[in-house]
Structures are given as C-alpha cells and as structure tokens.
Amino acid sequence: MKKKTKQAGPAAWLRENKWTCAVLAAALVLLIVGRLLAAPARVEADQPEERADYESAVVEQVLSDSTEKDPAADNGYRGEQLLLVTVKSGDYQGQQMQVYNYVGPLYGGPLHAGDRATILISSYSDGTVNATVYEFDRLIPLAIVVALFIAAAVIVGGRTGAKSLVALAVTLVCLFGVLLPALMKGANTLLMTFIVCAYVAVVSLTIVGGVQKKSVCAMLGAVAGTALALLFGLLAQALTRVDGLRIEDVEPLLQLRQTGTPIGLRGLLVGGIIISALGAVMDVTMGIASSLAEVHAANPQLSRRELFRSGMNIGRDMVGTMTNTLILAFLGSGFTLILYLYSLGLSFRQLMSSAYVSMEVVSGIASSVGVILSIPLTALITAAVFTREKQQS
C-alpha cells in the first residue's frame, strides 16, 4: 500500500515562511506610509502665462532639412529641420503640427518620417501655440533593452533572478516614490537617504533570501557597512572641503531652491555615496554570510574565532574586485569631464585639487571603505550568531 505524500499547499508555505511574510507585510505598510508622507502637497496655482507640455508625436513628413555633417563635431549632424508631426498624447492628441528640430552636438539628431519623438508644446495666454522637438522618443527602445535584461536575469538566475528583479523594483519605488519627493519637501538629506537605504537593504535581502540566520546577518552587516560609508564620506568631505554645492548639474537645483523648494543641497554628495555603496555592500555581506553558513554546516565544531577567520579569508578575495568596481564606476561616470580636464595640461596637483576630481575620489573611496569594513562586521556577526548555541552549551 502506497503512502500518501503530503502536498505542500499555500497554507503550508505560509506556515514555513511566516517570518518572511510578516517582514514583507510590515515593509509594505512602511512603504505606503512613507509614500503618503513624502507625497507633494497639492497647491492651487495661478493660471500661468505660459504652459509647457511634453507630448509624444510621430513624424509624418520632413518639410525642410538644412542639416549637414560637421567635421568639428566628429562628423555629427548640425542644422535644423521643419517637420510635420501628429501628436499622440495630451490635449492636442490627433492634431498635426509643424515643429522645428534643432540638430547639433548639444541637441538631438535628425529625424525621419515614421520616427517617434517627444515634443515641447508651449501654450501662451493669448492663444499662441509653439512646438519644438525635445528629444527622440526612446521609450520603446528602452523597453526592449529592459525586457532583454529581465529575460537574461530570469533565464540565468531562475527563481533567484526573478526575486532579484522584484527587489530591484522595490528599490526603484523607494528612490523615486519616497526618497526624491521627501528631499523635495525639505527632509534631511543624509538621514532620509540612510533610512531609505537601510529599508532597501532589509527588504531586498528578505525577498532574495527570506528570513534566515544568514540573511539576517547580511542585513545587519549591510546596514552597518552603509553607516560606515556615510561616516567616512562625511570625514572625507570635511578634509577635502567639497560639498553638494560643487556637484555637476547642481545649478538647476540652486535655482529651484530660490523659488521656494526647501531641498537640502549640502548632503547630496554623501547621500550619493550611500546609494552607490549600497548595492556592493549587500553583495558582499550576503556572500560572506552565505559562505559562513555553508562552512558552519560542513563543520559545526568550528569555534567563533575560526569561523570569523574563515569569513575574513573569503572577504579578502572580494575586496580587490569590489573596490575596483566602485572606483571605476565613479571614474567612468565622469570620464568625459576628466578627459577634458586632462586635455588642459593641468599638473597632477591641479587635477587632483579640482573640485570635480576630488568629489569623484571621495565618492569612490568612501563607498569602497563601506564595502571593505562591512566584511569584518558581517563575518563577526555571522560567526557570533552561528556559534551562539555552542557557546551557551
């Protein structure tokens, strides 16, 4: 007579993962509350003399084209086009308009019939309407790129890859739905960024690994490593005398602040350091915690000191690659400006003393310090947690 196999249904899964479900439910409540608190207040504004709308449009015909290749711009196009477009969204949907497309190194490229573009429609109180091409509409190409990324993550990573995509979605919601609106309302930049990053670390590691000993150790290590990156960033910022007011593209934010938006600018540099360090810190802490969990399972007789030493040996192999990754990422993001500064023939002292290069160095090193110091912290926490029962007996 065959034994009846016990089928694992939803109820059994919930019992087995009750702590994971509880943490994620609490995280969802916190996310909703955070979004409600950070949401911008509705203000009744006076009717402006000029209204600007960015709408999608399709090019029907190129009416005139004076673009030509410019050798000075690496054979890029320069000039202007007059286009006939059909508006596909907004109040002017379905209407045809003649719009100018200004082409050059600092603008977009030439457009052709059938291309989709984002156009800027300026409406004035006297009834006048002007429209120009803002940019080539990249929504569909970007959607294809994102779809390929999702497919690669799921095919290669399987269920874990799918979980990581959910964690990424939560991260994006936290950044764009909570952090940025909160900063626009005047929240403390450093405190708010750290809280959101700590939340992202806990939720992401819970989604990927569930609530287990190793994932809890990784969470604690990630939060501690992020805090250390923050502290080192503040120290380096004070020593080098650079702050958020010298960051590239901060001028529009200064203008925004002058119009009454209470955004804090001085913490933006260190806030960016925290965000950039978070991903690498989570990778390292989860790698250390998972490795030590396997080591302990293979040899439960190891002492706390021996398990900690194993974690440090594993972590040392990660330091070089992770440090390179972070510093190269920062230098790569500002590569064009660094190339321009180098072309000026500046001495090494002049180059390193420039505010921009100093900020890139501070950002890369502070992030790397957070990653490096999270290794012994995570190894210490994991060794203590996994050998606690042995120490008590």
Region spans (language model):
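Structural detector for short beta-strands of small beta-barrel domains
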Residues: E50-G79
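Helical hairpin unit composed of two closely spaced alpha helices linked by a short loop
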Residues: L278-I288, L292-I338, G345
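Hydrophobic secretory-pathway targeting helix
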Residues: M1-A52
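Transmembrane alpha-helical segments that form the functional core of multipass membrane systems
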Residues: A147-V154, R159-Q255, I263-S276
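Pore-lining and gate-forming transmembrane alpha-helices of multi-pass membrane transport proteins
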Residues: G221-T226, Q258-T259, I263-I275, T321, ...
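Loop-to-transmembrane-helix entry motif
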Residues: N17, K185, T189, G311-L326, ...
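Hydrophobic alpha-helical transmembrane segments of membrane transport and translocation systems
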Residues: A329-L331, F335-S393
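Extended, hydrophilic extramembrane loops/domains of integral membrane proteins
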Residues: V103-I140
